[in-house]
Amino acid sequence: MQTLQLVILFALFLLTVWLFFLNSRANHPSWAALEHRRYAHRGLHCSADSVPENSLAAFRRAIRHGYGAELDVHLLRDGTLAVFHDSDLKRMTGVTGVLEDCTAQDLAALHLASTPETIPQLCEVLSLYEGTGLPLVVELK
């Protein structure tokens, strides 16, 4: 019985510490810039309009609507940063392969969801958002 009480006490201690750190981060002033904004997850994509996720067209569309964006970034074999959600190319390009094994030149030949859109580099998306005042949330994969 005493062992169970110690385990429960330790779990409560860990929970208290975790909540303290979580709460202190959530109230940090730097988060205020991200609050009360609309974000387009992987850009403002729409398959009905042939605007695939994580494409420059999707990010342009998000900007036109005043949305910030969440995007995923992978490091390619040649050191280039590519904006793409999956590690596997198949779902969005129809090509079998692993994104991280490619170079920027390899990706330039692939089209997203049977559209003319290609997999953008991070620098291209940053250029689109430069000067807009809209936030980007970048997830490193």
What does each model-identified segment do?
Residues 2-141:
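Phosphate-group recognition and catalysis centered on beta-loop-alpha active-site segments
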